[in-house]
Structures are given as structure tokens and as C-alpha cells.
Amino acid sequence: MVGDVTDKWDEFLKENDEIVYIPMSSGLSSSCETAYMLSQDYDGKVQVVNNQRISVTMRQSVIDAKNLAEAGKNAAEIKQILEDAKFESSIYIMVDTLNYLKKGGRITPAAAALGTLLKLKPVLQIQGEKLDAFAKARTVKQAKSIMIDAMKSDFEKRFNNPDGSQINLEMAYTHDIAAAEAFKEEVQAAFPNNEIVMNPLSLSVSCHIGPGALAIACSKKIEYCNK
């Protein structure tokens, strides 16, 4: 991993003056800390962003970084702007099976067995560094409702933007695209003012939660002001 990253940085720096590197949240992976340590050998030419994002919210950070660069911001300024907005995002994930959380050591075998017996559909949350438990649903339908209601609450209370005009809304899923498309219709009905971007969950997340997962995510929009 280390060699791959630095080789790519070296390649990019042959034709570019600076790099903005955005790894996944430091609370979920050691790759962020590793990248930061590696960047110390590049005399400020590589700016590693630790803005606690992952999956579709990290994708939005990459788009934001590109737009900020086109607006005239340098790498250090982009890093600062993205990190200033590190807590202005939310992710809610419904897990369809507990087996992968058990295999990853995130829940005990006993808890997994009990949850499977009760047919629980946990809803997990990321608001910052960690992946945390948010709610337990008995059905997929209930889990969907919990996630939509939680996102509505975030729009209104966390971001003070009930109509969603200043918020990027995203969705993600593992394996079952048909179920994801059906859920997307429900989410779109709940948030008619938002354009929804949907992508598969990254492999680094999928391996911990397994197939059949559904997620809603959002991040507050960043203004791009020319110098």
C-alpha cells in the first residue's frame, strides 16, 4: 500500500505542483495516519485531508476539492476548507445480515445469533469518526423509515436546512441494486427537492456489513468562491 501511494504521488508531481489526498476517515482506517506520515517527506506538496468521510460522502469531498481548485484555491486551502466541514455530514446504513459484523468482531457471536433469531435489521450511523449503532428495526421497511426520518431530522436540526437546498443527498448499497433502486424512489419522494446520487458501497465498507445493505448519506454543500 505504501509503495503504491507514494509511487502515484511521485507520478502526479511530475506534471503538477501539489496534491490533495483524501483517504477514508481516520476513525475507520489507519490509512489516513499512514498517508499523513508519508506526506511529511514531500515538503508540503502533498496535503492529506482528514475530514472523517467515507464512501459517497468521500466522493463528494473529491468533487468539492476539484471545484475548489478550479476556483483558485491551493492545496493547503482546500485541505483546510474540507476539514472545517468534517462534521457536516451524516450516513445511515441498514445491515441486512449480522454475520459480517460478527466476523469483523464488531458484535459478539451471541449478539449475532440473538439478532438473527429476532430477525433484527440494525441501522448504523456515521457522523464523524466512528461507525456506531443507531437503531434496531424488526423489518427492512421499518429500517428504511428510520433512516428517512433520521435524515429529515438532520436536515432540520443539524444543518438548519429543512428544504435541503444546501445539502448533497446520496445513497449507497451492497449487491442488490433492484432493492436499492426501489428504496431510492422512497427517498426521492421524501426529499423531492434533492437530486440523489447513488453508488455501490466501497469494498472496504461492504466487507464489514455484507450484502443487502442500504444507506442514505448527506453532506452540506461547500461554496466555491473565486479568489
State where each predicted segment sits.
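Glycine-rich phosphate-binding loop signature in dinucleotide/nucleotide-binding domains
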Residues: 11-19
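Mixed-charge interfacial surface used for oligomerization/domain docking
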Residues: 18-19, 27-47, 53-227
